[in-house]
Amino acid sequence: MPLRHPRPHPVDGSDEQGPVSRFARLAASCTLLGAALLVLQFRSAGEAVPLRKSLDAFPVAVGDWQVQAAASLDPEVLNLLKVNDYVLQRYVDGGGRSLWLYVAYWATQRGGAQIHSPQNCLPGSGWEPVEASKLVIPLGASPPITVNRYLVQKDRSRQVVLYWYHSQGTDVAGEVQAKIAMVKNAFLNNRTDGALIRISAPVQGTVQETTERLIRYVQTVYPILGEYLPD
């Protein structure tokens, strides 16, 4: 099934990708990866940065959403990810509509540890992308954040997935942007800590209705994330 890039919530014109644009992005990613490896090699003495408090203490109630289940990652997955702390919980609202919150934190991305993009992990678990776009989510008094939005499908099941990266008080959507932030922070602050925030929900009602529910959840949970993730 071809991947579609819907236009209802565009950020800018950057999602128009021809062959040259895709090649340029790939080249930029490879260059940044090489730079990141050099930084991590020559500045290996940087300290691991702890969370403000453990994600084990993440609230069981977020607005009108209540935790119904919590899950643990397999030891093999943990060994692959080299994540320092995470929370993976299923929340349900009063209408019985559910979503999954996954927050993973790396105190350092040295020694082979690095954030794994859902763009790669979702197909590996059988979820194929159908639509991809970026959304700008307003946060009231705080600046808005840009997140990735994916519609994925496995057999006849569909999910909407929102995710973004957090590093030292900055939120970015793109993998390249996240690498740039890591390299910059490694040079300036000798820090490579970072987090991945992913929120997903099965399509209940229409895709747009499901997306809007996730947006409202992001707006509710975002201030709570600041109590855990370091600046």
Model-derived regions: residue spans:
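Alpha-helical transmembrane signal-anchor/signal-peptide segments
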Residues: 44-62
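N-terminal Lys/Arg-rich, disordered targeting/topogenic segments
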Residues: 1-17
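Short beta-strand-initiation
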Residues: 53, 84-86, 145
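Hydrophobic membrane-insertion alpha-helices, especially the h-region
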Residues: 25-41
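Bacterial N-terminal signal peptides that target proteins for export
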Residues: 20-24
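Short extracytoplasmic
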Residues: 58-90
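A cross-kingdom signal targeting lumenal/periplasmic-facing segments of multi-pass membrane
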Residues: 88-216, 220-224, 228-229
